[in-house]
Amino acid sequence: MTVAVFFGCTFIAFGPAIALFMFTIARDPLRVIFLIAGAFFWLVSLLLSSLVWFITVQISNKNSATQQRGLLIFGVVLSVLLQEAFRYGYYRLLKKANEGLLALSQEDTMPISMRQLAYVSGLGFGFMSGAFSVVNILSDSLGPGTVGIHGESQHYFISSAFMTLAIILLHMFWGVVFFEACERQRWWALGAVVASHLVVSCLTFVNPHYQGSLIPTYIILSVMAVWAYLCAGGSLRNLKLCLTCKDKDFLLANHRPR
């Protein structure tokens, strides 16, 4: 049973993201490189926030429950702000790199657009964030032990998997909206991305009341998905044509001779 829980939660958490990687990124070496670089930037932000957290915990009063809870909130907020700061830094780096690629290219168009870079880097952020948030939980799911034996929630593992899935997809959508906001200098949109990231992270404080964190998180996920779709140039008409297989440009672009 523990093996079934492990694989089930793993596929829930990482299945959609791995599918996106395999179908849209894996065949393009340049996209793979940018995805790995995005994951590295997220990892550096985690390293810095962990360092600050370690220092503050050492100098704090460990016997004060109120102070420790305040430090936990501070750590979450600091981590989110550092992640978004590194997302902006990665945007600036990609902007310079794209200009360099254009200068070296023999064509008049960029080898990869900023919208594609936003999607790829966001997925890189999401992969690394999801891995660090759920790997230890998945390891514990293999046993030994019985979930909920001491009266705790029996939905701990599956709830964690669905939260990880939401975080991975949200990072992808946040990346698209964030980069588009930087391109168009819409600072209110940047603020909305940071605010929604803070809200989602702080919602985890209501656990183990998982319905109190999962439901609002997936509502935010739905809103950000629509926003990212519009930022990527999508429309209701395009969606309808794609679903009904009437978008001739899309079909021709994806046609492969047999």
UniProtKB/Swiss-Prot annotation:
One of its GO terms (cellular component) is endoplasmic reticulum. Pfam families: Aph-1. It is found in: Membrane. GO terms for biological process: Notch receptor processing; Notch signaling pathway; protein processing. Keywords: Membrane, Notch signaling pathway, Transmembrane, Transmembrane helix. It is a multi-pass membrane protein. PANTHER family: GAMMA-SECRETASE SUBUNIT APH-1. This is Gamma-secretase subunit Aph-1b. It comes from Danio rerio.
